[in-house]
Amino acid sequence: IGIGVPSIVDSEKGIVYNVANISSWKEIRLKEILENEFNVAVAINNDSNCFALGESLYGEGKPYDNMVGVTIGTGIGAGVIIGRRLYGGQFMGAGEIGSFPYLDADFERYCSSFFFKRHDTTGAAAAENARQGEQAALDIWKEFGMHLGNLVKVILFAYAPQAIVLGGGIVAAYPFFKDAMEYTMQSFPYRVMLDNVRVIASHQNDSSLLGASALLE
């Protein structure tokens, strides 16, 4: 059993810490619990790490030695691939980019579903309204793209990848925020790095599942 969880993890011991969406999960020995229950091997990692691993092995990241997979949904996180191997850092927390300070809060408040709550809407509603040509919705996506472009620049500074693969539910609306994101990226100071990185929207729905299964290989 391979599992991705939205939190930091002791991957060797299979301990899950501080799951944001499950407040009672402060320090859960999930690997031990599941192995005792099902009598099979269990591997646990951060969910964004699983996404990045899946994309690196089977998806848009496959051509690249060094890439970052970014999941955009109820929150935002990243998995880092260096030399075609997952780099998790201590407690698999290397890609917790949503917690980077930004403006009056952090990037998660501006580059995930939290952003749309600020505009009294949802990503799905904003996408549907944008498809209908509603200017207010198009403006919301333009602003979202600007914030995401600023986060991409941070990723370039931190990891200098060859590719950044975007995944998660919000990426279905990629055409509405792509231009604003790319425009904002143009202020990155190292032109040679900017010219040699690809930002790609994932077309796979099962990258995280594939990455979680690969934890056992």
Regions picked out by a protein language model, each given a short descriptive name:
Residues 1, 9-15, 31-42, 55-64, ...:
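ATP-binding/phosphotransfer module of carbohydrate and carboxylate kinases, centering on a glycine-rich
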Residues 14-25:
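A charged helix-plus-loop insertion that forms the helical arch/lid used to bind
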Residues 24-25, 94-96:
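A short acidic/small-residue loop/turn micro-motif
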Residues 47, 73:
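Active-site glycine-centered loops adjacent to acidic/histidine catalytic or metal-binding residues
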Residues 80:
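Short aromatic-centered micro-motifs
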